[in-house]
């Protein structure tokens, strides 16, 4: 089924409230809107002091695995502190009803079934088109504003620090992540490393992967999840 735009008022309201709370760094409100907001999630929000607000939120949906559940693609304009131009962005979320019948964001990175479904839906042609459109919009915004360009470059350097780290360096896993036998998203999962865990860098893996040691075992973790 094709992407629907702002089709479900309750879902729109939930997503808007969630991103408004993120802009305010209102952890308590975010906890009420999700079924799980752990210490790593909290740190991610409170540490993102450079984010002032999420504006112009548009909610795109696809059916979830069950009735009354949805895969959500939220597009927005990100307002950074002291930067006038806004940066287009897109996030994927999973929304479902809780026991009392109200919609919440299902925020459990260890839910393999949902994770697999989210990956599958992202391959849909209309979703790929949306992702490309937002990427194009972001690139245009960056090219037309020097301040935004400089800021995004700085952010990119920060997130690539794990790739620049020396072998033997200690890195911290940013959120629960799969520890895989090979540098491939289809490879066997040896373990799930909890967010906040420190691991030792063994070597740079193929593009986008870092080989690390965890519990005396060597395996691969996505570079984006390490700092």
Protein language model regions, located:
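Exposed beta-sheet edge and beta->alpha loop/turn motif
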Residues: 66-145, 194-198
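SH3/SH3-like beta-barrel superfamily modules
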Residues: 191-224
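SH3-family beta-barrel domains
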Residues: 157-178, 192-195, 204-205, 227
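Hydrophobic pocket/interface hotspot
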Residues: 18, 29-31, 72, 95, ...
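Short solvent-exposed beta->alpha transition segments
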Residues: 27-76, 80-88
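A structural signal for short, hydrophobic beta-strand segments that form beta-sheets
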Residues: 56-64, 170-173, 198-204
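Short alpha-helix capping/helix-loop boundary micro-motifs
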Residues: 183-188
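Core segments of small alpha/beta cavity-forming domains
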Residues: 1-54, 116-166, 189
């Amino acid at each position: 089924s094709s992407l629907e735009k702002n089709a479900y008022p309750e879902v729109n309201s939930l997503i808007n409230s969630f991103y408004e709370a993120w802009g305010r760094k209102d952890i308590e409100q975010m906890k009420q809107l999700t079924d799980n907001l752990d210490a790593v999630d909290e740190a991610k929000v409170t540490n993102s002091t450079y984010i002032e607000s999420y504006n112009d939120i548009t909610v795109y949906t696809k059916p979830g695995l069950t009735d009354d559940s949805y895969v959500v693609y939220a597009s927005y304009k990100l307002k950074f502190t002291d930067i006038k131009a806004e940066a287009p962005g897109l996030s994927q979320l999973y929304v479902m009803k809780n026991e009392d019948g109200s919609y919440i964001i299902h925020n459990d990175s260890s839910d393999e079934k949902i994770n697999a479904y989210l990956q599958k839906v992202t391959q849909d042609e209309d979703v790929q088109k949306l992702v490309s459109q937002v990427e194009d919009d972001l690139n245009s915004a960056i090219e037309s504003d020097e301040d935004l360009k400089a800021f995004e470059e700085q952010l990119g350097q920060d997130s690539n620090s794990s790739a620049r780290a020396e072998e033997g360096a200690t890195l911290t896993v940013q959120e629960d992540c799969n520890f895989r036998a090979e540098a491939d998203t289809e490879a066997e999962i040896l373990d799930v490393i909890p967010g906040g865990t420190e691991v030792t860098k063994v070597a740079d893996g193929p593009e986008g992967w870092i080989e690390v040691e965890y519990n005396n075992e060597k395996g691969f973790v996505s570079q984006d999840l390490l700092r």
